[in-house]
Amino acid sequence: MDTLAFINRALVEEGYSLKDIKLVLITDFEPSSVEAIRRLLAVNQGVSFIGRKYVKEVLEKFGLRNVRFRAVEEIPSLEFKLPESGTVKVLPFRNSPQEASAGYLLEEERILFSGKFLGSFGEKGDTIQIFHRVFFPCRNILDYNVGLLESIGEEFEVFPFYGEKQKLSAKTLKEYFNYTVKGSVLEREVILGLVNGVLLNLSDEERENLLSSIGYLAEVDDKVIVDFYTEPNLFYEEFVNTLPDAVKSKEEFYRIVEKLLEHNFYVPLRAV
């Protein structure tokens, strides 16, 4: 999807253009974001950006060194005023042990612009955050993020990175997580079956990309995993976190995730 073209169409429908954008709040950062930001700056050099510190570092590596960028980590009390009016509270989410994103609460309107943590699928009434199990597999990370949501009070409306907008509350999330976490550690043979089921249904290129990232953690024979070189649940965590980068089609990724969701796959705390 051409992100910038999509944004431009939405603006035009409301009587605006890309030149009218004053501030961009970055929740999650993907490879296509660099080019979208570059094209936006070509037509609007006055736009400012707020996001995690690593985003600025990525932009600089791609030659975008003079961008008006403010890192979340540098915002006092994690709150700031909008250029026109209103207050924004920043929620520094964690996506996994390796990654980070951010949510932005428009306090007066009780609207939360969230990343993948609160994503949902389509119109299914029971799909409270399918993505949380992909990008937030560790219980300590879930507790951390739910704690951030508890800090902003009760019910709010979520506009997620993926999926449909929805009404939500920290209490609802907490009850859901506490319920689904039960019996979450998978047996070795279950993990082998799940992982190999995914591998055998990927294209050769996708399988090669996936195994090039995590193959060092397991013994591979004829396109499948036959043994683990680490604790199976820790391998599964790495496997799940690598999937979004390896699978080319978003629809295929959705299908894989729904299949994996037939099993709880929260994992133990990573050893520090």
Curated annotation (Swiss-Prot):
PROSITE patterns cross-referenced by the UniProt entry: HTH_MERR_2
Positions of the HTH merR-type domain: 1-27
InterPro entries per the UniProt record, alphabetical: MerR-type_HTH_dom, RibonucZ/Hydroxyglut_hydro
Gene Ontology terms, MF aspect: DNA binding
SUPFAM superfamilies registered for this protein in UniProt: Metallo-hydrolase/oxidoreductase
Gene3D superfamilies reported in the protein's UniProt record: Ribonuclease Z/Hydroxyacylglutathione hydrolase-like (3.60.15.10)
Keyword field contains Transcription regulation: yes
Keywords: DNA-binding, Transcription, Transcription regulation
The UniProt record lists the keyword Hydrolase: no
Protein name listed in UniProt: Uncharacterized HTH-type transcriptional regulator aq_603
Organism of derivation: Aquifex aeolicus (strain VF5)
